[in-house]
């Protein structure tokens, strides 16, 4: 089955937007901002070490690049409370996204590893698990 060029084109457009950043360096920026992705916002998302571990896991499984897309900045006392509760630096500013775009290698072995990781993350949420169609990207979206 040929790759879905529309799907890859959309992902390529997303990673080029000004609100998109390379995920690991974004998460590890030493500026005391609370950064999170995924899950129903701040409470169930990935933050701190858990977020870094998740992105590093994708890289170990063969991801060429992991991009956080649609990053927004939020400020308020609620952010400070959640950061302290999670043992993260005390701050009232957070950057967050509910989307990651994962560039997968062209070799099918790496694609299988990353597709399996995607299935482990989302399969329980009743999404259709993608198959290896030669696509260049996987899309992680938590709503």
Where are the model-predicted features located?
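Acidic, proline/glycine-rich low-complexity IDRs
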Residues: 116-143
